[in-house]
Every structure is written in structure tokens, then in C-alpha cells.
Amino acid sequence: MRSGVIAQKVGMTRVFTEAGEHIPVTVLKLSNCQVLGHRTSEKNGYVALQLGSGARKTVYMPKAERGQFAVAKVAPKRKVAEFRVSEDSLIPVGAEIQADHFVVGQFVDVTGTSVGKGYAGGMKRWNFGGLRATHGVSISHRSIGSTGGRQDPGKTFKNKKMPGHMGVDRITTLNLRVVQTDVERGLILVEGAVPGSKGGWIAVRDAVKKPLPKEAPKPGKFKVVGDAQAVDEDKAPADTPAEKEGA
């Protein structure tokens, strides 16, 4: 199981195929996505990679957080997240994951925070049908109607679908196809819509319900930056070259 990446949503556009068909795509940008630390089964009880992306000022950053980035010898990051991986998919601390970590044609799962829509009624929030347009209904055409019974049960049950705040939820969209990658600019173009607004942070992983392509690099495509911990040749997995460039 490979690591995912932290990307930033740029917006939507379209690309054309050789046959002239256009494909709607969402542009995701990798902003110096680097490895900050390892989580091992011996110390933490599970195996994972801690990644960071984006730039952050240290003016109001607590010393404890600054110390974590100093230990990893990485510039402070705006967004930090963990990705579960297998033991043979660990990437050196400080390495920067590149856009060709994903190959064209493979499927990915994306997770983001949906756009906030404020206080919404039952018809918009839960797709209720509303009340009748005529025959005695006045003003309350878009209301949800009764929310409970009579004397029995004599109450409104918990979790009843009602008007309220809509959006700003953690949403995962499965099986989006990678249409194109741009290593120089750090761009990943995926087919379809991605949850969240422009500038929002998106977690991109290999699809769990689709097979991983054989040409996908393992443990990933990365480059060692600065004083990153290089993989020893004796300890490196069989599919991990101990070079400056990742697999």
C-alpha cells in the first residue's frame, strides 16, 4: 500500500483527446509535499507516513511545532496529514513527492472539505418534496411538514432530518481517473469534480476499489531534498533504488 499526497485544488478546466472529445478535469497542485516523519509498528502500533504541504510563517507557530519541522529539517508546512502505508512503502524523511507518483490512467480516491452553503432548508439539504402548491397550503410550500407523531411516540427522534447548516463536511469521491500529470509544475489532472472550493486541501490516494497499475512506481516517485535521510542500499527494499531520485 503506497502513500497518498496532499494537493491543493486549483480549479476545473477541460482537456481534449485526439478524437476531439473534451474531458472535464480538476487541476490539483502539489506544493512541496514532503515527508515529515515515520510512524512504525514498534513505536506507534501502526505504519504510516506524515506528510506536509504548503508554506507557513513561523511568527505565530508554537515552539513545539517548530521543533517538529526542525527535527525533520523541513520548512514549516501549512497542511499536515498522515497516510497509512505498508512497511515496504516508507519514503525517506525530507523527500519531496512528485506529480508522477500517480500514472496516467490509474484511478484515485480524493478527500476534501465540501463547500459551505450556510443554513439550508429541508428541500435543499435532504431533498424533501415540500408541501403542495395549492389546496390550502399558504406560504409554507417549502417546509418539511410534521417532524413527529401524536401521543405515541410523543416526541421527535434524534437524528431527524431537518433544516440546518449544510456543507463543510469531509467528503471522499472514489475512482477518479488520472488524465494527465505535469512534473515541472507539480500538477495532477483528474477527471470529474473534486469536493471543496478553490485553494482547498485535498488528500489523493490510490483507489481502494481498483487495482494498482503495474507501472505505478513503488514505494513512490520522489526526490531527496537537502539533508533528507537517504535509503541505505543494504536496507532498501528490492523495488526501492538507493539514489537521489525515487523509484
UniProtKB/Swiss-Prot annotation:
Methylated by PrmB. PROSITE patterns: RIBOSOMAL_L3. GO terms for molecular function: rRNA binding; structural constituent of ribosome. Keywords: Methylation, Ribonucleoprotein, Ribosomal protein, RNA-binding, rRNA-binding. Transmembrane segments: none annotated. Signal peptide: none annotated. The modification N5-methylglutamine is found at residue 151. Gene3D superfamilies: 3.30.160.810, Translation factors (2.40.30.10). Residues 140-164, 212-247 are annotated as: Disordered. GO terms for biological process: translation. Part of the 50S ribosomal subunit. Forms a cluster with proteins L14 and L19. HAMAP family: Ribosomal_uL3_B. Belongs to the universal ribosomal protein uL3 family. One of the primary rRNA binding proteins, it binds directly near the 3'-end of the 23S rRNA, where it nucleates assembly of the 50S subunit. This is Large ribosomal subunit protein uL3. It comes from Nitrobacter winogradskyi (strain ATCC 25391 / DSM 10237 / CIP 104748 / NCIMB 11846 / Nb-255). The gene is rplC.
